[in-house]
Amino acid sequence: MSGPWALHAIFRVPPFGAAKIRAVKKERKHYHLDWTLVPENGPRFENLVACHLAKWVEFEQDVKGRDVELRYFRDVDGREVDFVVCERAQPKLLVECKWGDDGIVRGLSYLKERFAAADAWQISATGKKDYVTPEGIRVAPALTLLRTLV
């Protein structure tokens, strides 16, 4: 192992792929452990959420012995979800990050439809709306989700 991830400057998130979806299975996303290094607001916010989710996943693995992992979703049709937390290879938490109060991302709707038991969130950095869609997707400020994590 070499490069910035060997120095613990960045970490990688692998893609989530399941038999019933046409997911991209090779590309990994990279995030800075120091999310303040990211210059643009939207990507910096996504990086901040990645750090919080990665910390929570590691806590659940190390302290509680859970078989959980942090992934993301992107398919060949261009649908994407920023984060998919899986337990025993099954999605348990879907998280999409937005800077403001945007409409529901189609990738999130797509995954929620296929994995109805998973909790689905679209969180925003600056948005104020807090509601649940008819599909069962929670739209809320980021703090609402992040404060539930360790």
Regions found by a protein language model. Give the residues of each.
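Accessory nucleic acid-recognition modules appended to NTPase machines
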Residues: M1-P91
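Conserved beta-strand segments of alpha/beta enzyme cores
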Residues: E69, D119, G136-R138
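Active-site ExK catalytic segment of metal-dependent nucleases
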Residues: P91-D101
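Short, hydrophobic beta-strand segments that form beta-sheet elements in well-ordered domains
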Residues: V95-C97, A118-S124
